[in-house]
């Protein structure tokens, strides 16, 4: 076992000198363990990751926890391998830190549990799945207008309080119930309170048993925030590669991954690039994103919450992320204020899977007609606000009439929100979704009151609600 000594500490970056030229490999984990000898010292159990070889038998490392209490001359031990984290069934229902140590006070992970290194190559070209396959979510607005691809990457945009967390929980629930799939949630550089709330909400809604959670939150050093996404990805890869599952990987927030990299970049001695970001920004993002894919065995579909600094979409961090995305789901506050949940914007959300050769001609035509109707309604709203509905042509009145029904029908009750709403959640297969919207566009339900279309699953539920009101169907 190779041993070295600390020779310099610069915040989260630590330089270590090894004797006799036995340098640890890049990405190797090094350990510093020190027992406090008096009340002025603190116990130290710190993991470092080798980032650079500086020459003169010295390596530069990134700390995975606080470097408080480190002093020059402390002994460092090379573990001989990268950071390795537990994988498999033992991770489900548990909460981990970047090193794969449980932090939920539910006991230790068994010593014989399998552990995999967090740094691994992306699947080889010949291992990738060749067919584009849609991942049915059971959420109408997503499946119809911005469908997810198995093994795809989805960007989730939305401010505070518009329903990102509830949408994430519903996706976890539906994948577990309908596809038997598991989910991994990686909390990257977000608020500890939000992570704690999510854990308890998932416990209450019953989806925690199909989920592994990994957190490297805002208060942690950049090393932990930079690597925690890889820890979550490694856990998800096991379920794909060893168990042939279709899993979900949630990363909240992918911007913080880039931000953490830029924090340590200058300390590592790299020349910053545009706006102070690390020069290796595209490489680091590519190494993470290329591992998230479909193979012949299974798939990892990734849903990544994306913070856009100052709403500037040309900022290098979000711009680098966009090039990897297959679909975007945009949550709109105005829709949430209208009581339309999920508050997904049907005109801004996009997907490369919305093409006739992938979803089929009928689905494609219905989706485009829905978007055209909603777009026309949006254009007419200014006229309605100034002059009122009476000034519209008969054709435009019909557009408004149907657009409002479509807008309400894009909403539905979620299983994970049952405890708050008292209404049972609904999972709607894609075929039923397409049929429902097609019939609305054809005018089959023009005679039904528009408020009956709100928060329902299949189109038959609208008819039943109207009948209950005594409306002729």
Swiss-Prot record:
Pfam family, one: ATP-synt_ab_N
Cysteine pairs bridged by disulfides in the record: none
Keywords: ATP synthesis, ATP-binding, Cell membrane, CF(1), Hydrogen ion transport, Ion transport, Membrane, Nucleotide-binding, Translocase, Transport
InterPro entries to which the protein is assigned, alphabetical: AAA+_ATPase, ATP-synt_VA_C, ATP_synth_F1_bsu, ATPase_a/bsu_AS, ATPase_alpha/beta_chains, ATPase_F1/V1/A1_a/bsu_N, ATPase_F1/V1/A1_a/bsu_N_sf, ATPase_F1/V1/A1_a/bsu_nucl-bd
Catalytic reaction equation(s): ATP + H2O + 4 H(+)(in) = ADP + phosphate + 5 H(+)(out)
Membrane topology according to the record: Peripheral membrane protein
The keyword Ion transport is annotated on this UniProt entry: yes
GO molecular function: ATP binding; ATP hydrolysis activity; proton-transporting ATP synthase activity, rotational mechanism
EC identifiers of the protein: 7.1.2.2
Localization per record: Cell membrane
Binding annotation for ATP: 158-165
Cited function: Produces ATP from ADP in the presence of a proton gradient across the membrane. The catalytic sites are hosted primarily by the beta subunits.
Family listed: Belongs to the ATPase alpha/beta chains family.
Protein name per the record: ATP synthase subunit beta
Organism from which the protein derives: Bacillus sp. (strain PS3)
Source species taxonomy: Bacteria, Bacillati, Bacillota, Bacilli, Bacillales
